[in-house]
Design a protein with these regions (language model features):
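A short, Lys/Arg-enriched amphipathic alpha-helix from helix-turn-helix/homeodomain DNA-binding modules
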Residues: 2, 6-10, 14-46, 50-55, ...
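Short, leucine/isoleucine-rich alpha-helical interaction segments at C-terminal helix-coil junctions
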Residues: 119, 131-134
Length: 140
């Protein structure tokens, strides 16, 4: 049964570590809450101090634990969320790059294009065109 599996996991060799991660007040739980908040608020301007305070951590501890969990800084994580959502908007909702970039929180279209190309390897327009071509080829 599911309860038996859960019992065996929690009483096994990694059980203590897993329990500390799942503990309501653990760093892992606080980072999970910060990630959930960032996912809902990625388009807003954020201050790391505010996010750290929101989850009850000092800025330095928040940075350290966030990077340990995500392998990136909170700002890099927000940027990745914004770029991913902008790409989704351009591909699926057929928004142009300027509209998509503004909707996900970028103030500068040129900054958006630079960061997009750095992550996806192409300008937004070329990436969307190439992605649509590969989707139509795959559908044939």
């Amino acid at each position: 049964s599911d309860l038996e599996i859960l019992y065996r996991i929690l009483t096994g060799p990694a059980g203590g570590q897993l329990m500390s991660i799942l503990a309501a007040d653990s760093h892992g739980n606080r980072i999970a809450r910060a990630i959930a908040w960032l996912r809902e608020n990625y388009a807003r301007p954020i201050r790391i101090e505010d996010v750290a305070e929101r989850v009850g951590m000092s800025v330095s501890s928040f940075h350290q634990h966030f990077k340990a969990v995500t392998a990136m800084t909170p700002v890099q994580y927000q940027k990745q969320l914004r770029l991913h959502e902008a790409r989704r908007l351009m591909l699926l909702e057929r928004l142009d790059a300027g509209t998509a970039s503004h909707r996900v929180g970028y103030q500068s279209p040129s900054q958006f294009s630079r960061e997009y190309a750095r992550v996806y390897g192409l300008s937004p327009a070329r990436d969307v065109e190439a992605s649509r071509e590969s989707m139509s080829t795959a559908a044939e």
